[in-house]
Amino acid sequence: MIRTEPSAPVLRDRFANLEGSTYLISHSMGAAPLAAREALVSYWNDWSHDGPEAWDWWLPQIETIAAGIGSLLGAPSGTIALGPNVSAFQETIASALDFSGERCEVVYEALQFPTVTYVWDAWQRHGARIVCVPSDDGMTIPTERIAAAITERTALVILSHAYYVSGALVDVAAIVKRAREVGAMVMLDVYQTAGVIPIDLEKLDVDFAVGGSHKWLCGGPGCGFLYVRADRRMQFAPTATGWMAHAAPFAFEPAPMRYADSMMRYTNGTPAMLAYLVAAPGHALIAEVGLPAIRSHNIALTTLLLAEADARGIRTPTPRDPAKRSGWIALDVPDGARITQALIERRIFVDYRPGCGIRIGPHFYTTADEILVLFGALDELMR
């Protein structure tokens, strides 16, 4: 593990797109590791040279890559499955639950990323009853309001680790405690935090967790993951399934399904190996730097962001207490969409969300000078 002072960026030379740009968008798409290109070329070489025999090497990599993700999340060995995205894994878990009885409610926050709401809204056709917990300000939801929505009728609580609209962290422990009191399960979405905040899924005691690689984990799109608590792994048999979830996929047995006795039971068809292999170098870089050092550096730079914003009278909806925010800061400036596009044209990479503002997400490779470059450009564009 590399030890670094909070103000010292590291491993900038391991990335392809940091020179010639000011890369402040790791909350949306992490920078591209040079080793990811090597993995892509290696995949091509395996495919072009070995054809179908490449599967002999590719398939064991699924478990290796899953274990690497698990090590970044405090997840025990054998509790992570790989898949294309969070939407697919929401569907997988939904298909494993029974909504025919009194315990048929699915509780989620109104500030959930929309894909979650789309999947579960569709499951109302199959007996699920949705309980959506409202937000007063569109940025946060009181913990006690979420807890009050969880009852003996709740089958599953779907919880954001951090809200995508504001970066506010959620009190996971309090919600899990309430869910345990009434026998409900909890699924935690860590897409907004994995790779920038230390997470211990085993300690949090959630039943499921979902996320993906293309944000802070610097893994590019297409490598999502599902965590299932160790004592629940063999409890579920998803109907959203496929041949790779079978106990003996290469036996090509006809139905009925015989599920794998591993996390492969939560997968479906032929795995997208290219996405998994390309994601792994990013995961390795996160492990090399270490999440405590990453978080410390991120807090230092987001604190600098807040100070520069305050000096200019720029409002931010992001929590000011670092213990209550994820890895990015939002700046609520007039004509934010236009200014964001102008920044991108200067190769200062940020993004914009309506109702939130310009989002800036520094990572372990970000320098303090890059924060000042951003504000210098803002000073010009806001005149």
Predicted segments, located by residue:
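Pyridoxal 5′-phosphate
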Residues: 1-383
